[in-house]
């Protein structure tokens, strides 16, 4: 049954017939069936909600007729309806469409052939087309099933976690209710438990992230009690899978399958066995450039833009191009300033949920990614990749003006603005322009200071800065150097101080070779060579 908002949205999007493949009937709780609008259903339909009632499907041709505003409206309404079903505590298998919808992709576009074949497959299996039969979709892994618990159930699960924290892995995930609102993962009745380290995960995306560490990792759904001690690739190296033809080693079956597909043009055997996300009886499409395999032709087409460099989606604000529509959608939040995801610990806001999840590791102290060279740990994969450039010394991006080399293309683009004088980021309040968006964000705090210190009246743009500032008045210095005992109000200050003991000076002047502990000191020093006034 569509909500009033959904009806208005569907009316706005109609004007042509909406195609609806493979609906699912979802069993409602008894309390919901006995009261409210659902009680008015006929005997044959009572107690069931057809998934198509809250989900509208389009053919590819129909989807192309919608403008950007209509597509955004559709995306928001469908997620709202999905959240409504989830709040009822209904258990159902999640289709590929819903999973892609949560990631901001376009899974709701179906070809007529796909819809027909789906119905025929259900009929051949002796199942009533359009019904949920308590079994998984044959195109979806059994581990992709979902159980969305009600609010009271999640509170019970949180209480259990708080009373039985993991002794080995440290802090548990906090604010589950808050993260569940935005998280793309699936909440389970029982958490996934790592048999080697005892770490627990409520969401399958956290499950996958832990599983796909640089050293690998394998998790197991928690069994009764706290046993289930099995091997975990994060803590214990796992045996590799070797390709007999290509003589290459792989840590996962999916990697071996894709590698073997690149060596052979033979079609896969007709089998219904599901191996690491690939249905062996299903034809898949292989990229001619890198050999990566995909189950859908349109997914392959999107992937090939990486090799061709095609970027069909343009930002009408700054003219920047993107290869994926979702990347454009995320980029546009830079111009709108929208930051909907807030950290409950320090009040900091983020444009993307991934940024919030990564930031929360600062508070929990969780560091998942380890460098294989020096053993140093990092809270995010991107930070690990940037760190590894220190060991490889690779600097493939060279400035055509001065010959300076950079390890990242983005850093080269920022550097080139020092030659061109380009300052694309302008403050709408005072007109001052900046070469980097981060500099504009720092400057904007002058105009939008919301948090004021009650002791001295100084204002700050976010509550985390105010909390740090208040330590100046209280004299609190929780971060102490284990070498000399000197204490600091902030952790970054302790990290910089520690370099005095280690002798580490990572920032080197390319002109004279002088080394510095802090990057800011190097920047000030380089102005001497440039002839700028300090």
Swiss-Prot record:
InterPro entries named among the record's database cross-references: KRAB, KRAB_dom_sf, Znf_C2H2_sf, Znf_C2H2_type
Pfam families tied to this protein: KRAB, zf-C2H2
GO terms assigned for molecular function: DNA-binding transcription factor activity; RNA polymerase II cis-regulatory region sequence-specific DNA binding; zinc ion binding
Family as reported in the entry's similarity comment: Belongs to the krueppel C2H2-type zinc-finger protein family.
Organism name: Homo sapiens
PROSITE patterns attached to this UniProt entry: KRAB, ZINC_FINGER_C2H2_1, ZINC_FINGER_C2H2_2
SUPFAM superfamilies: beta-beta-alpha zinc fingers (SSF57667), KRAB domain (Kruppel-associated box) (SSF109640)
Domain (KRAB): residue spans on this chain: 49-120
Biological role stated in the UniProt entry: May be involved in transcriptional regulation.
Subcellular location: Nucleus
Upper classification of the organism: Eukaryota, Metazoa, Chordata, Craniata, Vertebrata
Zinc-finger ranges (C2H2-type): 192-214, 285-307, 313-335, 341-363, 369-391, 397-419, 425-447, 451-473, 479-501, 507-529
GO biological process: regulation of transcription by RNA polymerase II
Cellular component, GO, one term: nucleus
Chief location of this protein within or outside the cell: nucleus
Protein name: Zinc finger protein 671
Keywords, ordered alphabetically: DNA-binding, Metal-binding, Nucleus, Repeat, Transcription, Transcription regulation, Zinc, Zinc-finger
Gene name linked to the record: ZNF671
